[in-house]
């Protein structure tokens, strides 16, 4: 009886003599015992066959780019006003995409991923044109017309990257419609990582600000851009030369422009080397009395940098004072401190995609990493095909009738084959841009080498000194007058006392520029290799016991299996309500007697009366408390099965048992027909902002294109046979920058071609991209019946890839599958950083060491235009000297302190100026 105490049942009357009365009627069924221990795990099942590969997507065509036009000719001119600032050269053509890789043949455990395609050659970025010669006072020479766009030459094989070309002439970017966006192509065969592309060309250096008034060296420099005017002091020493940005070619000398908006003040530097004579600016207040000519002073010591003050509002210009005699030229002061790096220029047009590196070999499985923060939930993938039905297991032992407490959790079943990959979900909404970073102390780019120093003009005659007039009330600023002739330097006056330093400081932040148009969407990167399956994580704490579900329908009674070992007896439950007596079953055979239980306390023996007639059986007395259970006797032969009694009262649910070790996988059956697609899931929350990537090199900025109208969808074209890969084409000239077209409608899916025998992996030069089919994407066909799975054949040579089927409509997302084990993939190769957008091109910083590979970034948002620099000081009127030959480029300046600029975020990319 399984170790249960049946002493509470009515016992047959005991005979005084040792004569048995034979087997009595069957007793009532006792209460349900505790659940037995879990059985040993079953044997491991066989791996099921792999599912059929999905249909490949269709590749759209890439437009060919024409060759570059001939350079425009610069107009001749006498020395004089500067030429127009050159437009930044067009962006180099995008390299041809690599040949698509043939999808790997999926073996029993998922075949190896096909190797990636050879990378297209990276287009070269157009370099800025050389600086124009110094123009005359006459008009600017006309810019030559752009040459005609040549037709594209026949494609050639990719050559090794050539040497960095000379700075080419500047072309104009013209508008033009963009071609339709191609469909996503098959992943290409991965080639080796190409050499890094040439850095983007530096922008032209702006016109040089005029130098400060010459003074005796050694006194503190003039403050940077004007703050609130302090009391007028004697002329200070020359202010520190502004740091020159990363050198482009030397710009032509700019004419004195109108007064610019005040820029943010940089920290006051120590006196710089004396600059070339600048044009004289308006005097703030009347000049002090002229001192006697001073002796040539020695070099002054470096002053401490002044604290940054906020830029003051510019007051109206004061009346112009009389010119004092020019002093003797003092010795050069110490070199000023480097300025702070400037704001990042606006983002350029997207560059061509970088070369895809070769697929790495699978590394050893790493230790499981710390759980990352959950990313955004993507759209649910399409529902995978139903797994195979496992073989039926042996029938379990017949359960006791009645509703017992729930048993322990069963072992996890074998994991089914992975479902088909779901269609990619729509693009997430753009997150909010990150708030601007803390403002750094300065607003200039890293210093580059100084441009060539201009020649000094012949000295002019010194004007007579007039008496100091009374300080008039300050009138409003008049319009800037015409450029005066350059005066000859006069004799240096005696050093005046240094006026108090004005409170410099950063100016108000300029208004944010209009963000440029959205860059073109980068090519979709190749899918990384499947990472090795991670180990199981630590078991979580058991969850709370759920409310018991409704009782299921009673299943058919299984055949009795072999009895498992008896579990330890649980605590004695309270006896259930007594059920009604069922009909007596047929008498079973008496088993061998069990060990006798402990006898109850013997009652007192009554006096033996005369044996009377058998009287009426009295009512059964109350059940005595049960003695402890004796050890189980050996089991007797099984009696015939009695009918089940009525179900007992449902007990309380037991605590959840611990999950046993997972059993081996069962044999995977053939895949069932695919289920219906589920409904589209809700879009998940936006993921956390990723870490800041390192700033890419500044690209040449073109104007942003406008988004074109969405074109009508075409009818689906039939897939053509795959073309042979053509030789790598020569880089065509940059075409006219088109307006990006909108994405076409999806077409009907084509019939998937039969999977060919996989051929050997060819490494051909990438072919040219064919024209896109005009078709509309069709609806997905009904899945055919699933055939029986044949034995896995030997891996044959790889055949040519079949024609690409048309991409089907996005199916309804399937239900979310069970959570997989965490993968341990190798870190992906870094995606090519997008070029930066239009805006003033800042100087390129020195190239830092390569950081760790990050995930491919999305295109960043167009940066804000940089702040307008301060206007130069107006020079005195003098005659113009002849232009001298350009001097050699100066040495590069020391690197500036790292400034904090704005942070721009766009769709997960983060740029720091």
From Swiss-Prot:
UniProt PTM comment: Prolines at the third position of the tripeptide repeating unit (G-X-Y) are hydroxylated in some or all of the chains.
Compositional bias per record (Pro residues), positions renumbered to this chain: 883-895
GO MF, one annotated term: extracellular matrix structural constituent conferring tensile strength
Region entry Disordered, spans: 1-913
Keywords, in A-Z order: Extinct organism protein, Extracellular matrix, Hydroxylation, Secreted
Compartments in which it is found: Secreted; Secreted, Extracellular space; Secreted, Extracellular space, Extracellular matrix
Modified residues (4-hydroxyproline): 10, 13, 35, 41, 338, 341
Compositionally biased tracts (Basic and acidic residues): 602-611, 807-818
Start-end of Low complexity biased regions: 28-67, 125-154, 199-220, 264-274, 316-332, 367-386, 408-421, 459-476, 488-498, 527-574, 581-601, 619-629, 650-659, 713-740, 748-758, 782-797
Any one cellular-component term (Gene Ontology): extracellular matrix
Tissue/organ expression: Expressed in bones.
Pfam assignment, any one: Collagen
Biased composition annotated in UniProt, kind: Gly residues: 254-263, 281-303, 422-431, 499-517, 639-648, 696-705, 759-776
UniProt record, GO biological process: extracellular matrix organization
Note in the entry: These protein fragments were extracted from an ancient humerus epiphysis bone collected in Haiti.
Subunit structure: Trimers of one alpha 2(I) and two alpha 1(I) chains. Interacts (via C-terminus) with TMEM131 (via PapD-L domain); the interaction is direct and is involved in assembly and TRAPPIII ER-to-Golgi transport complex-dependent secretion of collagen.
Function: Type I collagen is a member of group I collagen (fibrillar forming collagen).
Family per record: Belongs to the fibrillar collagen family.
Protein name, entry field: Collagen alpha-2(I) chain
